[in-house]
Amino acid sequence: MRGKLLLVVSVILILLGGIVANVVQNDSGNIQVRDVRFAGTGGKMMSGLLFIPNSATPKTPAPGILAIHGYINSRETQSGFAIEFARRGWVVLELDQTGHGYSDPGAFSNGYGGPDGLAYLRTLDFVDKNKIGLEGHSMGGWASLAAAKVHPDDYKAIVLEGSSTGKPFAPEGDPAYPKNMALVFSTHDEFSMLMWGVPIAGDVVKSEKLKKVFGVTDTIVPGKIYGSIEDGTARVLYQPNTTHPGDHLSTAAIGYAISWFQKTLGQENTLPPGNQIWYWKEIATLISLIGAILLLFAAGDLLLQTGWFSSLKGTPQNPKPATGAAWWIGFALMFFIPIITWFPLTLIGNVAAKASTIFPQQVGNCVLFWMMANALLSLILFSIWHFASNRKKGGNLISYGLKTPGGMDWKKIGLSVWFAFLVIAIVYLSVVLTSYFFNVDFRFWILAVKPMSLMQTRIALRYLIPMALFYIMFAVVLQGQMRSLKGSTAKRMIMSTVVGALGYLVMLLILYIPLLAGGAVPISDVRMTLYVIVAIVMLPLFIIVSLISAYFYEKTGLVYAGAFTNAMFIAWFIAASQATHVAI
């Protein structure tokens, strides 16, 4: 009964979120959103979402805007900007960069896809070729700058959101290039040193690099327009009170972009910059995402009631978790080790796990390298605890959920693989159907669950075995060593989540409290900055995988069903959401 009720609730949430997100994205029918593909330089297929206001026709062409996401994101990350631009009568191409989303790899190639996106936008007969704007966040800004360099006469204005001009990522800026530039650089942007050479984001007004682009020597005044819009030399700096990824959730950051394009491209209607609705879509896709996670548990519960999978049902046998001081030592290790190793191991992974034809996603490889190293370290520490202490108390492979009292049950292990596959397949189907009928994915902010392309599916399959090993080890520690002997399944799930995910929350607090207090992120190497952003996603992911691990361990008495489900889910998540650097 509980599984059926959870199924109903999850389906309602998915449908509700999909319907509301679609209505907001389409502005209640005032905007048509098309999923488009087109051939770019060298025959690379490019992907985008095209937002077409009803007022834009071949007889009444409207200004066009190319909106481009940042590194390891996809086109939907720009939906807040795209929705609001389109509501103001502008045609918007929300582009997947090369090697991102559904655009062909490799990442960084062909000017990040920016020049091809601009060229495609100009082929549309309902776009006014004399009024085209470029907008890009972070690396999307570099893509926009590449477009401006390759096609200098084909755009009128540009908005750089949390981005910069200059080597090695983009052409150097000066008072004439790019034309009519607005820089929206948040007061707590994590990349201020990388982008503009200032350690504190709020000090970008003093950046010598930015002064050269503005053609001034004095401190830049935010909100003041320098140069001339008519001559194409206009410059302005806006500073919303948020972070680098926070630009996507900021009405101020989006409003500044709207305001600049109204000044440079002209107003198609009278909607002021502050009139925004995009956040309802963000809330709606979050509701769908929550529904999808609940569907995972509902599907698992109901599958265990079927004849084929009922043999997987069981209870933990002879549990011998750590107690007393040993438990607290284990908790401290599980708390500190992942966050202490996060930056060193991902940096090592940048060198040791380069993108290749086997594992073609650089950031995904770094995360996988970190996972494998942590799994090995966990195995060593767990073995020390077992042989030095817990074996004497009766702890064994049965206690840790690795085998049954009858021995290593390979049939159950194999059945657990099929069980996990069907659970994930059901959730995946809900994502595909939502994408098909409502043209949205499941997401909140920078956490997104999307349908995979064929190439991304092949990448996910390559991640499966190493990730299965990691999540088996994760479950053995979480359920075999750190499991509470008291309480209900729900209480044990909560405790598992605290043990499995609390460290990531503390890591984010350590990183972001100084930044939000007006300082900088406390890291010693600018190369680590990207993994500060990636760490944000680790918190919700480890909440989810901790819940899955605990739930299916309690339902089956073994670690495998939960571990394989986690491996498939995270392999899917990483393959679909990361940049692909090498074609396979």
Residue ranges: model-predicted function:
Residues 171-178, 290, 300-303, 307:
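Conserved serine/cysteine hydrolase catalytic core
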Residues 332-584:
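Alpha-helical transmembrane segments of integral membrane proteins
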Residues 4-13, 288-292, 332-333, 373-376:
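Hydrophobic H-region at the start of alpha-helical membrane spans
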Residues 30-277:
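Soluble extramembrane regions of membrane proteins in the secretory/endomembrane system
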